[in-house]
From Swiss-Prot:
Annotated keywords: Hydrolase, Protease, Serine protease, Signal, Zymogen
Organism of derivation: Vibrio alginolyticus
Domain of life: Bacteria
The keyword Signal is assigned to this record: yes
Start and end residues of each Inhibitor I9 domain: 57-134
Descriptive protein name: Alkaline serine exoprotease A
């Protein structure tokens, strides 16, 4: 089940000078087909670096049955039953439970309990919890000229700036979730459109900001003066304290809350990140699968973003930062995991005390993209997260950023294709043509990019045993199967969701009709084959 490996520290994606801050329920197959064979090796244990490790506290993640969507009631029931059984069996005092984005819990464990859990075949992996901290907030010149240059830049293809910002939409009917230090809902920038979701620091319903970072991010997404989507609804999800500190488990809890509570067209902003974390990556990936578009800060280490979480999550939109001259910000991470660049240096926005502040970081670039995602979701509220990503990338301006360090050269653009003249950066991608699968006949040589989907179908009679197998090649593709309609990221009957391309869906007794198959690129893939047998 692990889609990625390793685990390191997490920091905020805020940077100043050289410092870092940086459906309906799915049908369940016969239980015998869902059983995981007991592993002869103990579950993977990932320890945090000593300086940020939280002693004896661990995130325990369960093996998830293949044909159970994380958005289904069965997933929540499965998780709660697993927690109840394990806590009783091993005398564990559970601190919190994750039952929407990932299936697991957080608890303080003795060495004996840790050993017992690692030997339990129901456990997928265990990750030590760790401290997450923001570096001290440092302001730039609050009186700088052309303070809203970021907005000015994203509505035009080329420099120089024209000192105006225009958009085809304003985010009406869309909700943006800010997973951060909270939001000052009373700030004049928000005009009553901002509410608290949940506070995972104080464990209450008041996600007010006493740090500033979250309010600044929210202001760039949807502030009336400094925001991209000026009528979007904002929901603060507080996972970091007044001092900017928190934990990986707290951030996962925030992601889990969004996956459980988001409804309608939604986007989530995560202007935080750091070293690799399997649990955090899995939570974000699953939340995207539930239908929420996630915008992720690339990070501020001037390094390869693929080495950071959640920046490396392929189904999110990973954002690098630029300056007002269209250069990559010196602090911005880079590489193949970056999907788009956006203004991030010297960005003015709302502050927790009711005022305003100018700060820098991929933390500031990311909410520009979240705002544009809200505009595109208002344009078409039925688009999936992968389609939102495709729109952002295909509409972005090409070849404008200098010193990309091997990243895609795409600069965020807020308007629609109809307004971009001859410089649209290419047409929207179209899905691969749908094709019929014949029993025993493989379709080979399949390839695709991250987020790209391809559709196939199988027509069967009632009572047959159907197996759809994907295999071979390189990269990482995911297999989806659904009866009667094409699968989506949050509506399917089977989704093995394993690392690599070797995945199988089995239906013991088919219904009469058409089963639809979808292959989605978790990352770029090639040389893959698919075959149905019935």
């Amino acid at each position: 089940m692990l889609k990625k490996l390793l685990s390191c520290c997490i920091t905020s994606a805020l940077c100043f000078h050289s410092s870092l801050a940086f459906s309906q329920p799915n049908e369940i197959a016969d239980s015998a087909e869902l059983q995981q064979a007991p592993d002869t090796l103990p579950a993977t244990l990932m320890l945090a670096p000593d300086d940020i490790a939280i002693a004896d506290r661990y995130i325990v993640v369960f093996q998830q049955p293949q044909m159970m969507a994380s958005s289904s009631p069965e997933f929540e029931q499965f998780t709660q039953q697993s927690v109840d059984r394990m806590s009783g069996l091993y005398s564990i005092q559970v601190e919190s439970v994750f039952d929407h984005s990932i299936s697991g819990f957080v608890a303080n464990l003795s060495p004996e309990q840790l050993k017992d859990l690692r030997s339990d075949p129901r456990v997928d992996y265990i990750e030590q919890d760790r401290i997450l901290s923001l570096d001290p907030i440092v302001s730039a010149d609050a009186n700088q000229t052309n303070a809203i240059w970021g907005l000015d830049r994203i509505d035009q293809r080329n420099l120089p700036l024209d000192n105006n910002y225009s958009a085809n939409f304003d985010g009406t009917g869309v909700t943006a979730y800010v997973i951060d230090t909270g939001v000052n809902n009373a700030h004049v920038e928000f005009g009553g459109r901002s509410v608290s979701g949940y506070d995972f620091v104080d464990n209450d319903a008041d996600a007010s900001d006493c740090n500033g970072h979250g309010t600044h991010v929210a202001g760039t997404i949807g502030g009336s003066l400094y925001g991209v989507a000026k009528n979007v609804n904002l929901v603060g999800v507080r996972v970091l304290s007044c001092s900017g500190s928190g934990s990986t488990s707290g951030v996962i809890a925030g992601v889990d809350w969004v996956a459980a509570n988001a409804s309608g067209p939604s986007v989530a902003n995560m202007s935080l990140g750091g070293g690799q974390s399997v649990a955090l990556d899995s939570a974000v990936q699953s939340a995207v699968q539930s239908g929420v578009s996630f915008m992720l800060a690339a990070g501020n280490s001037n390094a390869d973003a693929c080495n950071y979480s959640p920046a490396r999550v392929a189904t999110g939109v990973t954002v690098g930062s630029t300056t007002s001259t269209d250069a990559r910000s010196s602090f911005s991470n880079w590489g193949s995991c970056v999907d788009v660049f956006a203004p991030g240096s010297q960005i003015k926005s709302a502050w927790y005390d009711g005022g305003y502040k100018t700060i820098s970081g991929t933390s500031m670039a990311t909410p520009h993209v979240a705002g544009v995602a809200a505009l595109y979701l208002q344009e078409n509220s039925s688009v999936s997260p992968s389609q939102v990503e495709a729109l952002i990338v295909s509409r972005a301006s090409t070849g404008k950023v200098t010193d990309t360090r091997g990243s895609v050269n795409k600069l965020l653009y807020s308007l629609t294709d109809a307004d971009c003249g001859q410089d649209c950066g290419g047409p929207d991608p179209t899905p691969d043509p749908e094709g019929k699968l014949t029993s025993g006949v493989p379709v080979s040589g399949l390839s695709g990019s991250s987020g790209q989907v391809a559709y196939y179908y199988v027509d069967v009679e009632a009572g047959q045993r159907l197996t759809v197998q994907m295999y071979g090649g390189s990269g990482d593709a995911d297999l989806y199967l659904r009866f009667g309609a094409k699968p989506t990221l949050n509506a399917w009957d089977c989704r093995p969701f394993k690392y690599g391309n070797n995945e199988t869906c089995t239906v013991s007794a088919t219904q009469s009709g058409r089963y639809h198959v979808m292959i989605q690129g978790y990352s770029n893939y090639s040389g893959v084959s698919i075959q149905a047998n019935y």
